[in-house]
């Protein structure tokens, strides 16, 4: 079929969840790759991931003293970037449903001066354990594509953000530059699973990361979903030629 990158032919993807529902499969997948997740992210992004996280923190309009939530926080790298901005008077809550990712997050926070303002919780992004209007803003990094119901996940983020607050997603996107996009998808289709096999011993897990990125909506489509869910000022910012994008919107005041 033609993929959503615009004309690059690939085999139709039917993600194999090994007899499990998507939520259980994704949870098992991230539990299995948690120990080497940060190293693999840096390798796959050629070290650009830190800068992308900083840009997401700017987009969510984090400021000193704010209270923010980081959904699908994983190893807490984005949570840490948020904490550096909100400072000691602020508070960050990171939520993830992978126990092993949260264990790795605890290790990452152990020597951080921001540990005291970051609370890590295991929970379900489809049913956030927070009251309405609890946070000044919400982020999700490389997480929405793993949810069984993307729109419900976005709606939950909107629910827990205060009126006027920002909802921000940082995730894989669909590059559009001719020539570049074909090379990128070849890299992501062939080399990323190979890297996962060599450095993490988890080729199948990294094949899922490829497949889920291909099936994830384009940055424009995700911005449209944000608007459909009720956010205003929806937009996207392409990073690295559209390989990654930040999609954002504001909860109406």
UniProtKB/Swiss-Prot annotation:
Keyword S-adenosyl-L-methionine among UniProt keywords: yes
Gene Ontology MF terms: demethylmenaquinone methyltransferase activity
UniProtKB keywords: Menaquinone biosynthesis, Methyltransferase, S-adenosyl-L-methionine, Transferase
Stored Gene3D superfamilies: Vaccinia Virus protein VP39 (3.40.50.150)
Pathway(s): Quinol/quinone metabolism; menaquinone biosynthesis; menaquinol from 1,4-dihydroxy-2-naphthoate: step 2/2
One record GO biological process: methylation
Binding site for S-adenosyl-L-methionine: 75, 96, 124-125
InterPro entries linked: SAM-dependent_MTases_sf, UbiE/COQ5_MeTrFase, UbiE/COQ5_MeTrFase_CS
Highest rank taxon of the organism: Bacteria
Enzymatic reactions: a 2-demethylmenaquinol + S-adenosyl-L-methionine = a menaquinol + S-adenosyl-L-homocysteine + H(+)
EC code: 2.1.1.163
Protein function: Methyltransferase required for the conversion of demethylmenaquinol (DMKH2) to menaquinol (MKH2).
Family: Belongs to the class I-like SAM-binding methyltransferase superfamily. MenG/UbiE family.
Protein known as: Demethylmenaquinone methyltransferase
